[in-house]
């Protein structure tokens, strides 16, 4: 799984995920499924905001990177992936500027068009189950929730999907591709099932020549929002390196 992640995700996303796991004492060599899940979630957050801007009339428009109007205001502020202190600084700044209610938990994005924070979810289970879990945790009608699955399903607060159909299709296609690539490598079952994950882990440890008695317990702790290696204040180049291109999974 670790090799798969390094091959199929943008190197910067991989580095951010590594730093997030290290900060919380999680070993990516052991918790490879969590490593893959963190990378997937971060990529979806960036794809969610890709090419979406707000013009002078306050209208949401889609602009390609090489467009001369790329200096328009970004529609979405990316909070996920920042250092925790920086993330709360950005959230507080947004609340002070827009009058938005401060969320109890760090959200993933802020939508300047709809003036609301957004919580993004990527699940390997039924979307409605994961949606309810998110809603019960957040307990706030002010934070908009949008859940994606690897099967192309999605669910959002009040069926308001925020993005246009084409933008959402890009995310769904990427998730489906990740699932297919995992399946072709025999990794999907272990990614979905904890029992299969333990079997795969033992197999990986043996193949690496490690002691058969090495610990195989997978931590149940949930990592908070990803921690980015440096702040990205809102400007036209803040996510250029990530938006330039997402690496495609090489053929098996």
UniProtKB/Swiss-Prot annotation:
Species whose genome carries this gene: Influenza A virus (strain A/Singapore/1/1957 H2N2)
Annotated function? Plays a major role in the shutoff of the host protein expression by cleaving mRNAs probably via an endonuclease activity. This host shutoff allows the virus to escape from the host antiviral response. Hijacks host RNA splicing machinery to selectively target host RNAs containing introns for destruction. This may explain the preferential degradation of RNAs that have undergone co- or post-transcriptional processing.
Per the entry's comment, what about the domains? The probable endonuclease active site in the N-terminus and the basic amino acid cluster in the C-terminus are important for the shutoff activity. The C-terminus acts as a nuclear localization signal. The C-terminus is recruited to host protein complexes involved in nuclear Pol II RNA processing.
Biological processes, Gene Ontology terms? viral RNA genome replication; viral translational frameshifting
Q: Which UniProt keywords apply?
A: Decay of host mRNAs by virus, Eukaryotic host gene expression shutoff by virus, Host cytoplasm, Host gene expression shutoff by virus, Host mRNA suppression by virus, Host nucleus, Host-virus interaction
- The name this protein carries in UniProt is Protein PA-X
The protein's matches in Pfam families, at most eight in alphabetical order, are given as:
Flu_PA (PF00603)
Q: Where is the active site?
A: 80, 108
Task: Name one molecular function that GO assigns to this entry.
Answer: RNA binding
Family to which the UniProt record says this protein belongs: Belongs to the influenza viruses PA-X family.
Q: Which residues does this entry assign to the site Important for efficient shutoff activity?
A: 28, 65, 202-203, 206
Site residues by UniProt (Important for efficient shutoff activity and nuclear localization): 195, 198-199
**Keyword NAD recorded:** no
Cellular compartment(s): Host cytoplasm; Host nucleus
């Amino acid at each position: 799984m670790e090799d798969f992640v390094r091959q199929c995700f943008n190197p910067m996303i991989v580095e951010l995920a590594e730093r997030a796991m290290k900060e919380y004492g999680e070993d990516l060599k052991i918790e490879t499924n969590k490593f893959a899940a963190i990378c997937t979630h971060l990529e979806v957050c960036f794809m969610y905001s890709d090419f979406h801007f707000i013009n002078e009339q306050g209208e949401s428009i889609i602009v390609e990177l090489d467009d001369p109007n790329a200096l328009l205001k970004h529609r979405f502020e990316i909070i996920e992936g920042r250092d925790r202190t920086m993330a709360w600084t950005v959230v507080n700044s947004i609340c002070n500027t827009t009058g938005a209610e401060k969320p109890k938990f760090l959200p993933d994005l802020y939508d300047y068009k709809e003036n609301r924070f957004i919580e993004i979810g990527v699940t390997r289970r039924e979307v409605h189950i994961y949606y309810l879990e998110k809603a019960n945790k957040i307990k706030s009608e002010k934070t908009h929730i949008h859940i994606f699955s690897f099967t192309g399903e999605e669910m959002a607060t009040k069926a308001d999907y925020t993005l246009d159909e084409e933008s959402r299709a890009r995310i769904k296609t990427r998730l489906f591709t990740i699932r297919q690539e995992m399946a072709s490598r025999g990794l999907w079952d272990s990614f979905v099932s904890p029992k299969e994950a333990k079997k795969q882990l033992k197999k990986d440890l043996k193949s690496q020549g490690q002691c058969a008695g090495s610990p195989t317990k997978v931590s149940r702790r949930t990592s908070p929002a990803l921690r980015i290696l440096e702040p990205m204040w809102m400007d036209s180049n803040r996510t250029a390196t990530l938006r330039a291109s997402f690496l495609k999974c090489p053929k098996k």
